[in-house]
């Protein structure tokens, strides 16, 4: 309808000028429905059958609710992820997203820390943070933290390259997706280990 209006040189406000046959029929139908419901309500409220009708409506509502509950008990529920066979694509997609969130949190934490320190004149420098880090953490903890960030960075960097390959409409078949997935795992192992040894 909007394409026809454009051809005629009209905009959407032209619809408001003259009601169509459809809108007139819809308005007539809704007014008939309103009139019927009002008449029925008036009849029942003035009728001696009011109590009987009310009781019948209550019984019908209870019976209807019981039928609905039986139907709901048989209705299939939305399946949980645990019923599916795990796929390489899930894990890599999840790791790609989680790695960005974790690295982003670390980045913003230190950025805010240094920004607030400069504003408040606390004199926080990278040298002081480095000294505190090496004094408070054991070598195993240092390697764990460094390894976590090294591998998180490696998998996110590799995932970004993988997405750039997909953006060129390459490796979009199932075999191609798995091929790039296994390449990403190998790339992550190599780059993460290299970053850990720095």
From Swiss-Prot:
Residues 51-99, 161-175 are mitochondrial matrix. Changing residue 96 to A/D: Decreases quinone reductase activity. Pathway: Carbohydrate metabolism; tricarboxylic acid cycle. It is found in: Mitochondrion inner membrane. One of its GO terms (cellular component) is mitochondrial inner membrane. SUPFAM superfamilies: Fumarate reductase respiratory complex transmembrane subunits (SSF81343). The chain crosses the membrane at residues 100-120, 140-160, 176-196. Residues 1-50 form a transit peptide. A ubiquinone binds at residues 93, 97. Forms part of complex II containing four subunits: a flavoprotein (FP), an iron-sulfur protein (IP) and a cytochrome b composed of two integral membrane proteins. Present with 238 molecules/cell in log phase SD medium. Belongs to the cytochrome b560 family. This is Succinate dehydrogenase [ubiquinone] cytochrome b subunit, mitochondrial. The lineage of its organism: Eukaryota, Fungi, Dikarya, Ascomycota, Saccharomycotina.
């Amino acid at each position: 309808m909007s394409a026809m209006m454009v051809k005629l040189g009209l905009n959407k406000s032209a619809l408001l000028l003259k009601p169509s046959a459809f809108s007139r029929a819809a308005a007539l139908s809704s007014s008939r429905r309103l009139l019927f419901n009002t008449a029925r309500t008036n009849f029942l409220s003035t009728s001696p059958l009011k109590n009987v009708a009310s009781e019948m409506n209550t019984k019908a509502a209870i019976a209807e609710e019981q039928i609905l509950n039986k139907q709901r008990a048989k209705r299939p529920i939305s399946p949980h992820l645990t019923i599916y066979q795990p796929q390489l694509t899930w894990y890599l997609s999840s790791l790609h997203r989680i790695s960005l969130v974790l690295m982003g949190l670390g980045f913003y934490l230190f950025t805010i820390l240094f920004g607030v320190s400069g504003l408040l004149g606390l004199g926080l420098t990278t040298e002081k943070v480095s000294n505190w880090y090496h004094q408070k953490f054991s070598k195993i903890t240092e390697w764990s933290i460094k390894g976590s960030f090294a591998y998180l960075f490696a998998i996110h960097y590799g995932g970004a390259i993988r997405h750039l390959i997909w953006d060129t409409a390459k490796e979009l078949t199932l075999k191609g997706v798995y091929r790039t997935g296994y390449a990403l795992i190998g790339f992550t192992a190599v780059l993460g280990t290299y970053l850990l040894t720095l």
